[in-house]
């Protein structure tokens, strides 16, 4: 896929301020949202996403996916197309801003789709600041017809980034465990799909038990555990695009929660010892050399690297019940950072480095929360019967996790770091243990 810039009429930076999003003033729209993205008491920004002009239905489809991405973020309110007072027939012409101001749209998205002679699609879009009466963004994309959804996600990322000051996360994938069958004979398959639930593909056939899939932070590659005949643990690498699977280790004892290092060159995992303890090890993916990081009679597990690769966070019951600890990447400077009541598990470092997400069990309830890397500022985002396994969007502002309700199978949910906009992700069957990919358009 090739991308080229058309024209951007202006670019500027404004000091972050607090604005009410419901006051439809002439203040540029992206300034208004940047000031409130980290708070939980703001209203979504009204935006008009017009049907992209095309000779067939592809323009309508692209616009629909763009609008759905923006709406699902909780930061935008796509306006009903029935309210539009202007029909955009020429996307290269400046819109009549008073019409869009009348319906209180603060942002306006227009576009067109042209089929090139070689069969590719050329997709152009423009983002307008309605009250500033200026173009914020203009981009052109070329892609194969079957990849039109990716272009839609990339356009949504451009809009999200321009209007919030944060990186987008729509052009991403989710790997997870698809679950079917009765509880005493559960069939679990590795599955992957776009972040909105589209383009579902099964990676495994259900003949082996698969657990804890995790994306590389640098490539479209995953690591996961598989138990052949439910007995012998294997750790695999799988290249998503080519479908190639590589065995990186077979272990006599149980292996728990393999995860990539921040540079994608190592895998860190917990290995069960003969005395019942579990310690953390890394494996260099080039040399296959194993390095032991912890030595304890307790259970150390669920390790995750900081974005710069210098720190590791993990869960351990060395103090009596599972708590969260950090240490240097070489195993030195061990510190406990969780200090409140309850048991803590599945910690994972934000891609931005500013938060660690976790699962917390207290008084029979399971919560998803975040804290700073020093343990300060703990906040619970959602609590329920059984919430578990947070994973970060690549922009570090949205979390995904899975939830089991009484008498029901697991489902996948998203929530932002303010604790708002909790939503269930559509999956064909029960689904657990999700992991979020890096952005596809930077691969």
Swiss-Prot record:
InterPro entries: 6-blade_b-propeller_TolB-like, PD40, Tol-Pal_TolB, TolB_N. It holds the Pfam family PD40. Keywords: Cell cycle, Cell division, Periplasm, Signal. GO terms for cellular component: periplasmic space. SUPFAM superfamilies: TolB, N-terminal domain (SSF52964), Tricorn protease N-terminal domain (SSF69304). Residues 1-31 form the signal peptide. It comes from the Bacteria. One of its GO terms (biological process) is cell division. It is found in: Periplasm. The keyword Signal applies. Residues 422-443 are annotated as: Disordered. The Tol-Pal system is composed of five core proteins: the inner membrane proteins TolA, TolQ and TolR, the periplasmic protein TolB and the outer membrane protein Pal. They form a network linking the inner and outer membranes and the peptidoglycan layer. Belongs to the TolB family. Part of the Tol-Pal system, which plays a role in outer membrane invagination during cell division and is important for maintaining outer membrane integrity. PANTHER family: PROTEIN TOLB, PROTEIN TOLB HOMOLOG. This is Tol-Pal system protein TolB. The gene is tolB.
């Amino acid at each position: 896929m090739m991308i080229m810039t058309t024209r951007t009429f202006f670019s500027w930076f404004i000091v972050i301020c607090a604005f009410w999003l419901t006051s439809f003033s002439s203040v540029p729209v992206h300034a208004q949202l940047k000031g409130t993205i980290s708070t939980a008491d703001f209203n979504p920004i009204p935006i008009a996403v017009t049907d992209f002009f095309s000779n067939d239905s592809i323009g309508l489809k692209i616009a629909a996916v763009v609008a759905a991405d923006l709406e699902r973020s909780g930061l935008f309110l796509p306006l009903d197309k029935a309210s539009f007072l202007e029909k955009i027939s020429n996307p290269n012409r400046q819109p009549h801003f008073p019409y869009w101001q009348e319906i209180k749209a603060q942002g306006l998205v227009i576009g067109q789709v042209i089929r090139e002679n070689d069969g590719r699609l050329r997709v152009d879009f423009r983002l307008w600041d309605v009250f500033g009466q200026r173009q914020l963004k203009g981009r052109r994309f070329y892609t194969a017809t079957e990849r039109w959804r990716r272009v839609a996600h990339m356009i949504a990322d451009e809009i999200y980034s321009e209007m919030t000051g944060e990186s987008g996360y729509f052009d991403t994938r989710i790997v997870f465990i698809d679950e079917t069958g009765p509880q005493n004979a559960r069939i679990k398959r590795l599955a992957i799909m776009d972040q909105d639930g589209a383009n579902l593909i099964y990676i495994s056939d259900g003949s082996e038990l698969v657990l804890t899939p995790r994306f590389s932070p640098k490539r479209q590659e995953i690591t996961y555990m598989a138990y052949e005949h439910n007995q012998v643990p294997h750790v695999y690498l799988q290249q998503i695009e080519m479908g190639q699977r590589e065995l990186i280790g077979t272990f006599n004892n149980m292996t728990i929660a393999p995860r990539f290092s921040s540079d994608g060159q190592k895998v860190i995992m917990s290995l069960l010892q003969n005395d019942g303890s579990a310690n953390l090890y890394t494996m260099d993916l080039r040399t296959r050399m194993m390095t032991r990081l912890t030595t304890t009679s307790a259970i150390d597990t669920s390790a995750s690297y900081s974005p710069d690769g210098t720190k590791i966070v993990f869960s351990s019951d060395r103090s009596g019940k599972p708590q969260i600890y950090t240490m240097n990447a070489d195993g030195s400077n061990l510190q406990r950072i969780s200090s409140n009541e309850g048991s803590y598990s599945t910690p994972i470092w934000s891609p931005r480095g500013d938060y660690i997400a976790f699962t917390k069990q207290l008084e029979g309830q399971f919560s998803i929360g975040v804290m700073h890397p020093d343990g300060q500022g703990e906040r619970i985002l959602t609590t329920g019967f059984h919430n578990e396994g947070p994973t970060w969007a690549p922009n570090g502002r949205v979390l995904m996790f899975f939830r089991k309700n009484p008498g029901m199978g697991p489902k996948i949910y998203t929530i932002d770091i303010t604790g708002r906009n909790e939503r269930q992700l559509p999956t064909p069957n029960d689904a657990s243990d999700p992991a979020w990919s890096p952005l596809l358009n930077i691969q």
